């Protein structure tokens, strides 16, 4: 699942930085599957987009996988925004 998420995001968004964190072990009742993920996506594709539009871009890239994931947390930053927090 993690590799599929990475592949879909990389094919649809020009990612300068991409982290996918499987947070499933922190949530009971979901053992053995990737059910909760945190995505940190850094891309200039987000430049000029508000938070909702950024998340829509991420969800569109994952549209064929969303039904298999219980919860997705998204951090979406432009390269300049990311430089300001790292």
Which residue ranges define each predicted feature?
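A short interface-forming secondary-structure element
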Residues: 38-51
């Amino acid at each position: 699942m993690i590799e599929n998420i990475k592949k879909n995001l990389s094919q649809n968004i020009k990612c300068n930085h991409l982290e996918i964190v499987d947070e499933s072990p922190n949530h009971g009742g979901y053992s053995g599957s990737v059910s909760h993920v945190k995505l940190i996506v850094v891309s200039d594709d987000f430049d000029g987009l508000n938070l909702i539009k950024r998340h829509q871009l991420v969800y569109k890239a994952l549209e064929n996988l969303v039904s298999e994931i219980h919860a997705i947390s998204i951090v979406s930053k432009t390269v300049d925004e990311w430089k300001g927090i790292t």
